[in-house]
């Protein structure tokens, strides 16, 4: 256990990425030089006693090979990109077991970057807004991004590309835990025959006139001209004319019907448990509902081990998460044993003072403790970054 603990401590304190500030460019009129003194120490964990409870659970997991431990990593673009979190997830699951991918969200449907092992595709019209820009009328919850639609004609397909994250358990997180979605793991295709107007054409030959062509096909000259956008009777050799016709021809259309499965409603989510491992699933509208919003999905398997969930929003600050109580209300759905907060990059380019930043951070921690009192909390310092892709942040 000692070696495993040392490895985890090293990863937690040393893995940082010299990324640029968030990928969605936000113009800031100026920066403020904070008067707070910065001391550059070696990587270390301050107040390590605060995570003793987590390490005790980690020790039990290592010894008994039973149960699951949930790590939830909250942050900005470094976390949404699943770079830091993917490395941590792989290392911890290699050491303590893989219990599933954890939290995911259809970021690509919200027109932003997605986590590599998970792919989403969708049909339908969706609106999305990040917690940076959303007001409190928007259903911003666990993902930090509002994704909604008022159409009941849509589908969202989840496809897990990496076999090690195939799943047997799915949890659906929605505002107020409303039953908004049906879930399908199978579908059937029905071929439907319909009648469509038959397309008749005529290629003009040398010497033919428009009136003669109309007589040949028993249509009026006016109808023939209208069908081809002609304003005069002049036509040229070789032109292909569309001939108005009342004839029809069959057209075969394949209609896909998704077969919904029963979900189990709990206090925090709607769940599905499968006897076999799944790599894809489809979400369709509950036909008894008109407004749809999705806050997140949780994927697990039947194995003991670590579930490492990343929740990141490009450009986010502590204050952006603090604006939305729903984020904290839904946090217990992840059953967190350890919560890692990696924010501060975007604050460092803002006009916040150190006192303002720590006030927001304290508020965030207090809200987390209120909803997840048994979770240990680790706050990491921001990684190196650059402003506007060229100015090094030295503050």
Regions found by a protein language model. Give the residues of each.
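Alpha-helical cap/lid subdomain in secreted, periplasmic
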Residues: 20, 25, 135-195, 300-307, ...
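Second-shell loop/turn segments in exported
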Residues: 69-79, 209-213, 315-317, 347-354
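Bacterial Sec-dependent N-terminal signal peptides
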Residues: 1-30, 35, 242
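Serine-esterase "nucleophile elbow" of acetyl-processing enzymes
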Residues: 45-125, 129-131, 162, 170-195, ...
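Solvent-exposed, acidic/flexible segments
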Residues: 77-85, 203, 207, 217, ...
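Primarily a LysM-type cell-wall glycan-binding module
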Residues: 191-221, 231-232, 239-240
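Short glycine- and acidic-rich boundary segments immediately preceding or forming the N-terminal edge
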Residues: 19-58
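Solvent-exposed, polar/charged alpha-helical surfaces in well-ordered, non-transmembrane soluble domains
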Residues: 52, 56, 82, 86, ...
């Amino acid at each position: 256990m000692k070696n495993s603990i040392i490895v985890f401590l090293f990863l937690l304190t040393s893995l940082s990425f010299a990324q640029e500030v968030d990928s969605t460019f936000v113009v800031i009129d100026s920066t403020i030089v904070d008067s707070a003194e910065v001391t550059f120490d070696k990587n270390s964990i301050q107040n390590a006693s605060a995570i003793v409870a987590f390490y005790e659970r980690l020790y039990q997991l290592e010894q008994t090979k039973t149960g699951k431990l949930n790590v939830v990593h909250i942050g900005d673009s470094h976390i949404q990109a699943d770079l830091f979190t993917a490395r941590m997830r792989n290392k911890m699951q290699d050491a303590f077991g893989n219990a599933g991918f954890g939290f995911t969200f259809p970021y690509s449907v919200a027109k932003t970057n997605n986590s590599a092992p998970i792919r989403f595709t969708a049909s339908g019209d969706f609106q999305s807004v990040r917690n940076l820009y959303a007001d409190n009328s928007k259903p911003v919850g666990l993902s930090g991004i509002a994704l909604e639609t008022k159409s009941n004609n849509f589908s969202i397909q989840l496809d897990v590309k990496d076999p090690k994250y195939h799943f047997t358990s799915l949890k659906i997180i929605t505002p107020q835990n409303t039953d908004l979605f049906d879930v399908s793991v199978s579908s059937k295709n029905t071929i439907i025959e319909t009648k469509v107007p038959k397309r008749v054409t005529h290629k003009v030959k040398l010497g033919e006139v428009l009136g003669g062509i109309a007589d040949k096909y028993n249509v009026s000259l006016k109808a023939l001209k209208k069908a081809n956008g002609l304003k005069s009777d002049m036509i040229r050799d070789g032109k292909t004319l569309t001939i108005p016709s009342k004839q029809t021809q069959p057209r075969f259309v394949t209609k896909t019907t998704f077969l919904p499965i029963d979900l189990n409603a709990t206090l925090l989510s709607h769940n599905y448990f499968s006897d076999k491992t799944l790599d894809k699933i489809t979400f369709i509208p509950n036909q008894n509902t008109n407004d749809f919003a999705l806050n997140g999905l949780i994927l697990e398997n039947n194995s003991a081990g670590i579930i490492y969930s990343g929740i990141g929003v490009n450009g986010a600050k502590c204050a952006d998460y603090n604006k939305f109580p729903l984020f904290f209300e839904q946090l217990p759905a992840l059953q967190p044993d350890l919560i890692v907060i990696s924010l501060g990059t975007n604050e460092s380019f803002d006009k916040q003072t150190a006192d303002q930043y720590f006030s927001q951070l304290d508020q965030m921690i207090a809200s987390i403790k209120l909803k997840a009192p048994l979770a240990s909390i680790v706050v990491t310092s921001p990684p190196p970054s650059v402003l506007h892709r060229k100015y090094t942040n030295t503050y």
